[in-house]
């Protein structure tokens, strides 16, 4: 049985398997669009912010 999924970027249906090297995306273009959205912080993993992981402000700056 062939599993079909929709590309998360353009919603094109594709077969999940070795013939789809960019899965879950349909193409390199859709893969790069998604990567760009993460890099531009348009996407993020929801959850509480851990203050220990935040950088300290430079001297004289205020926390936002």
From Swiss-Prot:
UniProt cofactor note: Binds 1 zinc ion.
Region of interest (Disordered), residue spans: 43-64
Listed InterPro entries: DNA_gyrase_inhibitor_YacG (IPR005584), Znf_NHR/GATA (IPR013088)
Top-rank taxon: Bacteria
GO terms, biological process: regulation of DNA-templated transcription
Entry-linked SUPFAM superfamilies: Glucocorticoid receptor-like (DNA-binding domain)
Binding locations of Zn(2+): 7, 10, 26, 30
Gene3D superfamilies assigned: Erythroid Transcription Factor GATA-1, subunit A (3.30.50.10)
The entry's keywords: Metal-binding, Zinc
Cofactor(s) annotated in UniProt: Zn(2+)
MF (Gene Ontology): DNA topoisomerase type II (double strand cut, ATP-hydrolyzing) inhibitor activity; zinc ion binding
Biological function: Inhibits all the catalytic activities of DNA gyrase by preventing its interaction with DNA. Acts by binding directly to the C-terminal domain of GyrB, which probably disrupts DNA binding by the gyrase.
NCBIfam families: PRK00418.1
Quaternary data: Interacts with GyrB.
Alphabetized PANTHER family for the sequence: DNA GYRASE INHIBITOR YACG (PTHR36150:SF1)
Family statement: Belongs to the DNA gyrase inhibitor YacG family.
Protein name: DNA gyrase inhibitor YacG
Organism: Aeromonas salmonicida (strain A449)
Gene designation per UniProt: yacG
């Amino acid at each position: 049985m062939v599993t079909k999924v929709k590309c998360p970027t353009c919603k094109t249906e594709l077969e999940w398997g070795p013939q789809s090297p960019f899965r879950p995306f349909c193409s390199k273009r859709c893969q790069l669009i998604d990567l760009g959205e993460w890099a531009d912080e348009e996407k993020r993993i929801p959850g509480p912010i851990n203050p220990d992981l935040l950088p300290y402000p430079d001297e004289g700056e205020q926390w936002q």
